[in-house]
């Protein structure tokens, strides 16, 4: 009996579940053979995947390091402490909680710690580049709180901080949120701090999309200006899928510990926390700063070339990893554009643009991001070609010869920049 159980837990995935093993391999092949331009995605290191796929998966560890409700936590305590220390060092924070399962969970913990149901929160309108957790009516943030939204200025498609200030003075929110999912310009955290102080509001920065750029110093940091900062650990930070909360004030930060556990989560995912620690360690290396600079340079090349080809870009360019195409300029919807590029092995996503006449299910925009392909080694020249492939496909959607050429160019680009040279999946071997 004992031998039988040991045999089952030591079996390779290909033997124990060939269906799942096969699907994982198909997904690996898809990632290798497609151009990944979804702005919220990236390719994490094999070291991160090894940590996440380790025996730490087996360990329950409710509570904080050295304050657990379970025994046998001495090693996960050390791992979590490393993750906390690295997060603090990377972002210049006095306090960090590495337990949130996602960015949404991190935001919810902040709401739980700082607000009461019925309080007023102020964040960017989702259709202008905000996020579901910043007060969308379909999210708990939009159900529990009174929500007021600010947006970009119609002509520049950028934030007008005086308009944000006037709205805050009128509505007097308890919490102001800055940080977005589809805003390609630099965020003026100091200006938001001034507005929050003027109306007596807490200031939350959700830097999920730009955390890697902040860590590398290529985007201003919110830490010194905001009461609390949340982020995901993937996207531009290039770690596992998860969340993180940071504070400049350790005493203030500790109130979020209880909001995470037991307020909104049970046991932390220590295998994911280990992977976060690995990714944070990677981001502390000089190479990561070089990578992040290239992410922004590539986005600017992509935006510039797309515009040269006659397709409008929201706000006229980008300061970060995001490029948002305004397809009204060529009489196309985001839904159609998403399908067209997917047919030539480019993954992106349809997205609303400011003052979009289309529904969120159709949209007038296509959101692109450069973080993942930069990880593969794509440089300025390669991204110029990526821009041309996208433009060729969108500008001549009915031309089958152009479609075939685009497919071949994508195949060649993927071949020039292989992803995982030594495939990490020992269980699949």
From Swiss-Prot:
Signal peptide limits: none
Record-annotated site: Plays an important role in substrate specificity: 234
InterPro entries (alphabetical): PyrdxlP-dep_Trfase, PyrdxlP-dep_Trfase_major, PyrdxlP-dep_Trfase_small, Ser_HO-MeTrfase, Ser_HO-MeTrfase-like, Ser_HO-MeTrfase_PLP_BS, SHMT-like_dom
Superkingdom of this protein's organism: Bacteria
Catalysis performed (reactions): (6R)-5,10-methylene-5,6,7,8-tetrahydrofolate + glycine + H2O = (6S)-5,6,7,8-tetrahydrofolate + L-serine
Cofactor(s) needed: pyridoxal 5'-phosphate
Subcellular location, record wording: Cytoplasm
GO biological process, one term: tetrahydrofolate interconversion
Pathway(s) served: One-carbon metabolism; tetrahydrofolate interconversion; Amino-acid biosynthesis; glycine biosynthesis; glycine from L-serine: step 1/1
Protein keywords: Amino-acid biosynthesis, Cytoplasm, One-carbon metabolism, Pyridoxal phosphate, Transferase
PROSITE patterns according to UniProt: SHMT (PS00096)
GO molecular function: glycine hydroxymethyltransferase activity; pyridoxal phosphate binding
Catalytic class of the enzyme: transferase
The protein's assembly and partners: Homodimer.
Family that this chain belongs to: Belongs to the SHMT family.
Protein name, per record: Serine hydroxymethyltransferase
Annotated organism of origin: Prochlorococcus marinus (strain MIT 9313)
Gene name linked to the record: glyA
């Amino acid at each position: 009996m004992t031998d039988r159980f040991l045999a089952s837990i030591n079996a390779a995935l290909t033997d124990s579940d060939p269906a799942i093993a096969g699907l994982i391999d198909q997904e690996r092949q898809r990632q290798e053979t497609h151009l990944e331009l979804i702005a919220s995605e990236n390719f994490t290191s094999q070291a991160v995947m090894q940590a996440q796929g380790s025996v730490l998966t087996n360990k329950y560890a409710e509570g904080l390091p050295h304050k657990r409700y379970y025994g046998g936590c001495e090693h996960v305590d050390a791992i979590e402490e490393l993750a906390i220390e690295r997060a603090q060092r990377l972002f210049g924070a006095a306090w960090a909680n590495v337990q949130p399962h996602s960015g949404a969970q991190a935001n919810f913990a902040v709401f739980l710690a700082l607000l009461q149901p019925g309080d007023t929160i102020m964040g960017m309108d989702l259709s202008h580049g905000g996020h579901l957790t910043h007060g969308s009516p379909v999210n708990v943030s939009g159900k529990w709180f009174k929500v007021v939204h600010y947006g970009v200025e119609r002509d520049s498609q950028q934030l007008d901080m005086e308009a944000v200030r006037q709205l805050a003075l009128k509505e007097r929110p308890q919490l102001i949120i800055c940080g977005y999912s589809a805003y390609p310009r630099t965020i003026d955290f100091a200006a938001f701090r001034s507005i929050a102080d003027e109306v007596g509001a807490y200031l939350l920065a959700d830097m999920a999309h730009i955390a890697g750029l902040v860590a590398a110093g290529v985007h201003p940091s919110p830490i010194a200006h905001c009461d609390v900062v949340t982020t995901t650990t993937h996207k531009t930070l290039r770690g596992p899928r998860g969340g993180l909360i940071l504070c400049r004030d350790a005493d203030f930060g500790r109130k979020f510990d209880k909001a995470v556990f037991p307020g909104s989560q049970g046991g932390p995912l220590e295998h994911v926390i280990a992977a976060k620690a690995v990714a944070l360690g990677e981001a502390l290396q000089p190479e990561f700063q070089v990578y992040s600079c290239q992410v922004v340079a590539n986005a600017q090349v992509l935006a510039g070339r797309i515009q040269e080809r006659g397709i409008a870009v929201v706000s006229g360019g980008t300061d970060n990893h995001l490029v948002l195409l305004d397809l009204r300029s060529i009489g196309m919807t985001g839904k159609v554009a998403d399908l067209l590029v997917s047919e030539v092995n480019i993954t992106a996503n349809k997205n609303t643009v400011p003052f979009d006449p289309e529904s969120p299910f159709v949209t007038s925009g296509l959101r692109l991001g450069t973080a993942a392909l930069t990880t593969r080694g794509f440089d300025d020249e390669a991204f110029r070609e990526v821009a041309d492939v996208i433009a060729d496909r969108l500008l001549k959607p009915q031309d089958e010869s152009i479609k075939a050429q685009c497919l071949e160019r994508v195949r060649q680009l993927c071949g020039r920049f292989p992803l995982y040279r030594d495939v990490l999946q020992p269980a699949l071997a």
